[in-house]
């Protein structure tokens, strides 16, 4: 299987070079489950796209500092590509910004959250049991780092997970699109660098709590397994 990573950002954080760029982070976490997966990187932030849609079996849109409702030309071009992938029922995964821009591109709405920043390790509840993540319960923990949120899902989307602070935390569209607001790719030390960099924006209390939660266990490998099962169906 080949997954095309539609990279929407560049890592420029001080002290973060050891973690690489987002495509490398995603490759590492997917290879932890299936070392045979191939990856192709497309810098959509610089208008780089596959020549043909079927160049890859599935695509994944990364996180980004940009807003899904931005009028930047590359953001609008990415929305157009999402619509093409949807029309062709090409497998597509969205993570954080990817989750948001897929919702925006297909008729949903993304806005700055009235609840402010959502940061740290947090739990999200699974609503649709056909997407069980483990045999024990219907909650899982992921790293979060976002201020925008999906406030309205696309008309044909099915909500499968959420929480009080992130109601539209995960959704599917038919059998070819799966999106999650939580991160699967971020190392906890890298997340700490993000929170350090954004401390003033986040606020002292939320920053302190977010850093404290980074000692909690996370379920990114369980989520990666579900994503792979989804794209391989």
Q: Residue ranges of each PLM-predicted region?
A:
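Conserved beta-strand termini and adjacent loop/short-helix elements that scaffold enzyme active sites
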Residues: 42-44, 113, 145, 162
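Short glycine-/acidic-enriched loop or helix-start segments at secondary-structure transitions
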Residues: 15-16, 51, 70-71, 103-105, ...
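N-terminal beta1-alpha1 cap of cysteine-dependent amidohydrolase-like domains
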Residues: 1-73, 77-80, 84-88, 208-233
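A short acidic, often aromatic-flanked loop/helix-cap motif at beta-alpha or helix-coil junctions
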Residues: 46-50, 118-119, 151, 167-168
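Short, glycine/charged-enriched secondary-structure capping and boundary segments
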Residues: 18-21, 54-56, 73-76, 107-110, ...
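Amide-donor transfer/coupling interface in amidating biosynthetic enzymes
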Residues: 2-8, 12, 87, 126-233
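Conserved beta-strand segments of alpha/beta enzyme cores
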Residues: 38-40, 109, 141, 158
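Cysteine-nucleophile active-site neighborhood
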Residues: 62-130
